[in-house]
Design a protein with these regions (language model features):
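Active-site region of glycoside hydrolase catalytic domains
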Residues: 1-153, 193-203, 212
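Fungal extracellular Ser/Thr-rich, low-complexity intrinsically disordered regions
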Residues: 232, 236-262
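Substrate-binding cleft of secreted/luminal carbohydrate-active enzymes
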Residues: 102, 125-129, 133-242
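Feature targets compositionally biased, intrinsically disordered low-complexity regions
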Residues: 34, 58, 219, 253-256
Length: 262
């Protein structure tokens, strides 16, 4: 299949991410007037894109290939999208998948306490029911997720900001190896259980190029690297074998780490 556009920055995510401060413009004059995407516009864009992709006169994408659309960081905006008069998916839309990207750093921006207990509670009581509910409207994939969080970094990352954003990372580890293992195994278990309520999930990323051990300010960022997470035993062996197997299969399945979707 094909995803129409990745991570459109909408009226929900723009203020939450504080985009113009997080990502400073190289050319401020050229960037002047930049702003978020409205959901009404985005929905029209997706419908137009869908019909063009399925257009038989233009080498149509066959219906056995999914058309994927990203939620714009607001998954509940899509309950009435592509619906017919009966409230079901309109017959003109076939094999459509909703992509949502869910991170603990985003949970922190939404007020999740930066504690092991806080992460577990947020994932189980916010993310899990959210995925389950939206799966009644579309097949849902969690197209990006990882174990990264501020506790593992030893500092508040203010929503996943790094030295590249001007944030100063911890200069020394604040957790022992065993404490890190316990932290990450816990958030892995709760997230894997939550994502299993959807139709698939993809770890971001398989491999980082940054040397997080020998480069100052990057403590905790190795949690983005699936290979390092597996090597350091950060996935719980006590989880459902199918969930662990699905995640570990990513080593041979591709760069994001795919949980297969029927």
């Amino acid at each position: 299949g094909i995803e129409i556009i990745n991570e459109p920055n909408t009226t929900t995510s723009w203020p939450m991410m504080n985009v113009t401060e997080r990502y400073k413009a190289v050319d401020p004059e050229l960037a002047e007037g930049t702003g978020p995407i409205a959901f009404d516009w985005l929905k029209d864009f997706y419908v137009t894109a869908y019909h063009r992709l399925r257009d038989a006169d233009k080498g149509a994408l066959p219906t056995d290939k999914a058309v994927v659309f990203h939620d714009g960081f607001d998954i509940e905006q899509w309950k009435d999208f592509m619906r017919g008069s009966d409230g079901r998916l309109a017959p003109e839309f076939e094999n459509v998948v909703l992509d949502t990207h869910q991170y603990l750093m985003t949970a922190e921006m939404m007020g999740c306490p930066q504690t092991v207990e806080g992460y577990d509670d947020f994932v189980r009581n916010t993310y899990a029911p959210m995925i389950a509910e939206m799966s009644e409207y579309f097949p849902v994939i969690v197209g990006e997720w990882c174990l990264f969080n501020s506790v593992g970094c030893g500092v508040d990352t203010h929503g996943g900001q790094s030295v590249l954003n001007g944030e100063e990372g911890a200069q020394a580890e604040t957790l022992t190896a065993e404490q890190k293992r316990s932290l990450y195994q816990g958030v892995a278990e709760s997230q894997l259980a939550a994502w299993s309520k959807g139709s698939g999930f993809y770890y971001w990323n398989y491999k980082l190029l940054t040397d997080t051990v020998n480069t100052p300010g990057w403590i905790g960022w190795d949690a983005w690297d699936l290979g390092r997470c597996i090597a350091q035993d950060w996935f719980p062996s006590r989880s459902s074998p199918s969930l662990v197997t699905a995640t570990c299969r990513a080593v041979t399945m591709g760069p994001r780490g795919a949980h297969t979707m029927d």
